[in-house]
From Swiss-Prot:
Belongs to the GPI family. The active site is at E350, H381, K503. It is found in: Cytoplasm. CDD domains: SIS_PGI_1, SIS_PGI_2. This is Glucose-6-phosphate isomerase. Its EC number is 5.3.1.9.
Length: 540
């Protein structure tokens, strides 16, 4: 049965027509919001987090029908299959067991293997942190460069930045991902080769960007006086292909394993997170895993009606497939979560930006929305104008951390006030009549410019304090949200074939840039002209 033919889908279409013009400010009016209030009915907790869904354009009936949709789409069955280690990535014939990386149950899939690798990580991380592991001249490691791209970069960078307040001050963490040499050159200007450790992270250890940067970094070490037989003191590798790591020149003892049953964008819990563990220490890394495991248990055990990942995913479907929203915004009111929107861009769009269903037929409904965002309050002074007064409705996830992780506590009430006020303003709006009063006598022409449509939907996620545990829960919340949506849309969130074609053609273009003569028949006229211009520039 296709999605459009599910009874709940049909019922949701009728329900949408009934409430599409209803206004949130009316629903929140005191006479329409008796106890239990909307805030009480639509605020739920799990995994140490709280989520206020009340400012969404939903009613009790909306949630009832959305949960019915989840059941008809067999969300619970696919969830259970994923946790059990069944093949839930059929195009690659793989399980998706990122949850096993943080499981405490000794009967969980691959528990012994995961525990052994984490113990190896912890031993190494402690040695780097306490100075037992040194560079080839005996100096302590003061700089760690993580070389990876996509899931091998975004997750570790996001978490390391978010948890700087619990990280060691003795080691600086650097992240290099782009094949643009400026990325690596910028970092090399800041580090001493005698005090630098490189972590090269690639599932296959053949990724173009990562291996280009790794080779350049290896050459830099040698040029700076590191003997080739001493490079083992400065390089470790993380990969599912240990043989390729050794072929690159990294000592076998310096190889940390990841597995093909963990997707890159779900892998920060594995040895891919070695840079995180060095930064915050093994004990705090365990807390990160524990927080994710808290959310895993909530996802598995909470009824769908009160299940945070399920509700977050279903409400996203409500806006994407019924309201027709093209994008959604993530606005963490926390500078520590600066890189969370970038991380979620990959998690959501690489996972669910698909058009082929599991049975190979193409969807006839929208899937992943464009994910974007910026920390508050910066975003207010950049794009919130469009959110408030533009014609496009963009659903928003606000994320508020209730207690600061820094000593400037007097700033925090201002930060929280802005977060909560934005959600209220987006919901309420300002009518033309109200705008005329604001404009004042004789300025009626200004009133239209002072109106706000309102009725803009938002969810507010509350985190008591930004700790490794709460961050782990927050990340896992979005991981499971992705699975919920993928299940309803009947797509595979664990592959990423969309990145392949460009990589294949990229190798052809790279060869053409270096060829003695350009074959003008090989490409379309636009690409040929671009290559010709680049060839001329590269020869200058």
């Amino acid at each position: 049965m296709t999605l459009n033919s599910l009874p709940a889908w049909t019922a949701l279409q009728s329900h949408f027509e009934q409430i599409r013009h209803a206004r949130l400010r009316d629903w929140f009016a005191p006479q329409n919001d008796p106890a239990p209030t909307r805030a009480e009915r639509f605020t739920f907790s799990g995994g140490g987090l709280a989520a206020d869904f009340s400012k969404n354009r939903i009613t009790d009936e909306t949630l009832r029908l959305l949960v019915q949709l989840a059941r008809e789409a067999r969300v619970e069955a696919r969830r259970d299959a994923m946790f059990a280690g069944e093949i839930v990535n059929p195009t690659e014939g793989r399980a998706a067991l990122h949850t096993a990386l943080r499981a405490t149950d000794p009967h969980a899939p691959f528990h012994a293997q995961v525990s052994a690798e984490r113990a190896k990580m912890a031993t190494f991380a402690r040695a780097v942190r306490n100075g037992t592991w040194t560079g080839h001249t005996g100096k302590r490691i003061r700089h760690v460069i993580n070389i990876g791209i996509g899931g091998s970069d975004l997750g570790p960078k996001m978490v390391t930045h978010a948890l700087r307040h619990v990280a060691t001050r003795d080691i600086s963490m650097h992240f290099v991902s782009n094949v643009d040499g400026a990325d690596l050159a910028r970092v090399l200007e800041q580090v001493d080769p005698e005090e630098t450790l490189a972590i090269v992270v690639s599932k296959t250890f053949t990724t173009l960007e990562t291996m280009t940067n790794a080779r350049s970094l290896r050459d830099w070490f040698v040029a700076k006086g590191c003997p080739e037989d001493a490079l083992a003191k400065h390089f470790v590798g993380v990969s599912a292909n240990p043989a390729e790591v050794v072929k690159f020149g990294i000592a076998a003892d310096n190889v940390f394993e990841m597995w093909d049953w963990v997707g890159g964008r779900y892998s920060l819990w594995s040895a891919v997170g070695l840079s995180i563990m060095i930064a915050i220490g093994p004990e705090q890394f365990d807390e990160l895993l524990a927080g994710a495991n808290d959310m895993d248990r909530h996802f598995r055990e909470a009824p769908l009606e009160r299940n945070l990942p399920v509700l977050l995913g279903l409400i996203g479907i409500w806006y994407r497939n019924f309201f027709g929203s093209q994008s959604y915004l993530v606005a963490p009111y926390s500078e520590a979560l600066h890189y969370l929107p970038s991380y979620l861009q990959q998690l959501e769009m690489e996972s669910n930006g698909k058009s082929a269903r599991l049975d190979g037929r193409f969807v006839d409904y929208p899937t992943a929305a464009v994910t974007w965002g910026e920390p508050g309050t910066n975003g207010q002074h950049a794009f919130f104008q469009m959110l408030h007064q533009g014609p496009t409705i963009v659903p928003i996830d606000f994320i508020a951390v209730l207690t600061p992780e820094h000593p400037l506590a007097s700033h925090h009430p201002k930060l929280l006030a802005n977060c909560f006020a934005q959600s209220e303003a987006l919901m309420l709006g300002r009518t033309l009549e109200e705008a005329r009063k604001v404009a004042g006598p004789g300025k009626e022409d200004l009133a239209p410019h002072l109106t706000f449509p309102g009725n803009r939907p938002t969810t507010t996620l509350l985190v008591d304090a930004l700790t490794p545990r709460s961050l782990g829960a927050l990340i896992a919340l979005y991981e499971h949200k992705v699975l919920v949506q993928a299940t309803v849309w009947d797509i595979n969130p664990f592959d990423q074939w969309g990145v392949e074609l460009g990589k294949i053609l990229g190798k052809v273009v790279e060869a053409d840039l270096a060829a003695d003569a350009l074959d003008t028949a090989k490409h379309d006229s636009s690409t040929t002209a671009l290559i010709a211009r680049a060839r001329a520039a590269l020869k200058r």
